[in-house]
């Protein structure tokens, strides 16, 4: 099968996140199964326009801001003649409206849609543009098969007018052979960790406020990730007088991420909406409980009271209480962590890739 994937970024882009990791893990495995995969994405400064990433032939065009305007033209000039069996729009950020491209077989892969949450991240004009860009989905994509990474995302699509019978839910995976527990690395004092981008809509401020409410002398909060909201978060840390206890690590390599997760008593996530929450599953694979907002997508990657705790969104006090529960009963860290590891082992990238390939074969045969 010859496959073209459209996504704003590839996994090596400095702005890459969970969607790009998902793309790489799934489609590199599909390549390994003997299929051909091209990726059309945006470029950035001082990188080649063509590159091969684990068998995926990557075409880069434009920038993060110009990609949606240039992608269709590049496709028509350079890729349309390749006679792809199926084209996949990894539909995130602003839709590319691929049903208007004249593609024969199309699948829309969705992690999550922004909806009103766009107004928590961007200026009102930009947020309004994102919100409006999602409005035509039901009309333009009404005959397009969808692949969603969670039931929450599928429900969101249905609420927007997509027929449920057109949606296939295929959960993300995690590399449990690389992400493994090591109790010897667990910190003797409470460490809470956030791993992810520092964007306003991620609500890392809730995590910081929750940690500040813990008011425990030997506890620390370690924040790993980059983003344009770091400075305001650092200001919040200073204003709450917890600067000595909060470390901003910036970008950390994969091995350091694993050591951080093993060291932590819990990984903490306060996003009001995610497609799934890959970082939760990575923590679970390392035998680390998760404290997370009971938000769409996220709630499917944590079993409340078994692999961690779900708390009401935008509620620092509830998150503080969950943190305090682990501090007061340290044995819970090991109990929840062991259950989290077993939970993570049920999600593999091999399963996700095979289910995706089966879905694509069904679409091509239809």
Briefly describe each language-model feature range:
Residues 125-149:
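Membrane-proximal helix-turn-helix segments that form the acceptor-binding/catalytic region
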Residues 147, 183-213, 222:
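Conserved donor-binding/catalytic core segment of Leloir-type glycosyltransferases
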Residues 152, 173:
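Carbohydrate-associated surface elements
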Residues 234-252:
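Nucleotide-activated donor-binding/catalytic signature segment of Leloir-type glycosyltransferases, i.e.
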Residues 272:
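Aromatic "clamp/platform" in nucleotide-sugar-dependent glycosyltransferases that forms part
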Residues 289-292, 302:
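Short hydrophobic beta-strand element within catalytic cores of glycosyltransferases
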Residues 304-305, 309-316, 325-330:
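Conserved acidic donor-binding segment of nucleotide-sugar-dependent glycosyltransferases
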Residues 318, 325, 332-346, 358:
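A short, well-ordered alpha-helix in the C-terminal region of glycosyltransferases
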